[in-house]
């Protein structure tokens, strides 16, 4: 069942950073908005595709959510609130302006929750950050998303956050191109559409 869901998924990962990919779970935000996180199961599926959950972990969370439907609904709303706050924060960054305090407050609330769950665990000859009591935590994916946002906001890469130049897209992405001149979240879709429109307009003007 999980394999079928992934094959028919509408999620795309063109942001080059986890938290930016999460903000891009709304299609055509400024024209004909299409919400991609319509249920807690959708949130779990996105988390699985983003490699935050294994297939077994995703399956367990779905079963857990069936037993805790009200809590799952609250987590979904928290996820959407966090996503919208992150979108506005990084949109402001991309445009060279300052985000609103209430948007940062939303992020800080989730980040504080995440850090309260953080722990350092040994892995082979090294150590890594993990989360305590995560197995049945319906909001466990939010911890990693909030940490991802905090990492990006405090990194040198913050200056490379961009907003897609396509008017019908406006997704966010991290520009990792060599000369930092990337304009589109995905050249194959938004870039090609923009070039086609430009060519059509020029051809019409010279006709």
Regions found by a protein language model. Give the residues of each.
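Short helix-coil boundary/hinge micro-motifs
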Residues: 1-160
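Cys/His-clustered metal-coordination modules, chiefly Zn-binding fingers
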Residues: 128-207
